[in-house]
């Protein structure tokens, strides 16, 4: 009896995978190219990766370390070994939520995310514990554990010009029947996305938005083009957390997240890294910088208006030392250049500054943060790097 039930469950799970329409790289090691110099690019400080570096991976965000910008994704189909894909954000790694720039701390646990993952940053190979060799043979994607981009479903699909056309709702079958939202994709095929008709779980926990308000399921009509966010569902399904029936409702969410982002960066400062340094014999020096990408355009405009930005050195996690404003060095900007079509991770903005004092962290390839004309606030003390123990604690991700 148990064998029969198990067989029926496995058959149903197989049908769910086929119905989901995921476009994913093959998991078989035989199908994994042994050598691919672009995919297997090893990132180094001071150089942005080439286009196409790394792999696409998706899963539910189940673990976050917001201070050090690390986390773990879970594949709902149970195929990943180890069961979570742990990762660290690259210094220039970008997060998007509801179509706006974000930080890991903004993402609710359980949110289904898409990411672009590279091999570890040179010098940071031990930051994320490496899977066992037998696990890597079966699941080679586990080696790619430094993220350059992480985004929820609505950000991912909307960025690629995709939406979902509602076909209707239907009662699902299987051992645990659930109501299903039947949809088909509208727009181009997307690497790592769902590229054919799909069924998503929908129930009373799903938030349905119209005219910037919560509405009932009776507002769901066949033919509507919508955006959705997803999470884990039983038997390898995906469940809807939010459905936006009109652009106005999604825009309201995007603006709220944008304001969160502005508040965060104005208090933590804009990140970038040092390109070149010239030390003066009598103290001080000159420095050229590149600002990281993925920030709201208003922040770049505000930093451009600040001809004397204060600059603090920072860790690869973007954390700063103690009172980051008090220890930041005032500068005089001498050059500002905006380059078109920058590589992923870069804003394309380069600037040169002169400084009366050169901190130890002002070295080529090292991370810095720039303060504009923003009100200074004292950060929570657990975000500071103060003692050697703090560096040791931040050097590796502690797995749950």
Each language-model region and where it sits:
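Initiator methionine at the very start of the polypeptide chain
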Residues: 1-2, 26
